[in-house]
Amino acid sequence: MCTAATYKTKDFYFGRTLDYEFSYGDQITITPRNYPFSFRHAGTKQTHYAIIGMAHVAGDYPLYYDAINEKGVGMAGLNFVGNAAYANVKPDVTNVAQFEFIPWILSQCASVTEVRELLAHMNLTNTPFSEQFPLAQLHWIISDETASITVESTADGLHIYDNPVGVLTNNPPFPQQMFQLNNYMHLSPKQPVNTFADDLTLTAYSRGMGALGLPGDLSSASRFARVAFTKMNSISGDSEAESISQFFHILGSVDQQRGCCEVTEGKYEITLYTSCCNATKGIYYYTTYENHQISAVDMHRENLDGTTLICYPVIQGEQVHFQN
């Protein structure tokens, strides 16, 4: 289970939590402009936009979980188990394997408008990366500073939805996630007034009662509602420090703690990492379950005209700042 969100102050921010019971050994990975992308069915791109994100690198290929490109477009894949379905290769369209969807989009799109144009002629195929890495059942959020969309490939085809909240979790399908927000239309950051009955004297006895009824469990539908409410009522200053701090607080509203979500006997899902990308400046910030200090990699401090992947290991272990 995972949660992705967008946030806009002076700059545009994009990020996600990755919630799972173990890590594949992920790295912050920069794909420079001249790294050759050899797509399974869509030819080779010798030059393209530079990309930075979290990936598992297998056979010198970046299997991105979430990433941004140098033009400010962000994209993340989130679990969509039981609903995701991919097609066989088809004629007269661009066939893109599921595992290469993120680099295929981010390598060539400078806006969500351009993404939509590509998706109109694309078929997402069931081609696996390898026998060791079978197909992942995912759906995706793709965003720039002006728009967000959700892309879902199901048994009845490829669907592209406007995403007005700039949030995505997992199941159910996105239209149902949006519809369930109707259940929470009464929520407010303001203190409630008595509309229960004119004949009763009812008063708010605690701060925060305007959000009474906001779900607090770890299910994907509840996380969608909670992070949407938090994000859409969120206020911060425009500085970089204020913006990234607020973004981590937004996604912190759906953090998963070890012991609260048992997936098999003795195995627990946790928030392995939380990312916050300044998509305007090309900076990838992150924290991990074991390290709450914010770490960062700036793509523009690297040679973006190179031909080989640039990888940074995830920093683990709490970084405690003693004051005495």
Regions found by a protein language model. Name each.
Residues 8-11, 69-71, 143-147, 152-157, ...:
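Short acidic-glycine loop/turn motifs at beta-strand connectors
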Residues 121-159:
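Catalytic cofactor-binding cores of redox enzymes
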Residues 20-22, 81-83, 156-159, 166, ...:
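Short, surface-exposed beta-strand-loop junctions and turns on beta-sheet-rich folds
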Residues 92-128, 240-248:
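Proteins synthesized as precursors that undergo proteolytic processing into mature forms
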Residues 1-13, 118, 127-130, 135-136, ...:
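C-terminus-biased signal that marks the final domain/tail of proteins
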Residues 1-93, 121, 126, 311-315, ...:
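A contiguous strand-loop segment
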Residues 15, 76-77, 151-152, 161, ...:
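Beta-strand residues in well-ordered beta-sheet regions across diverse protein folds
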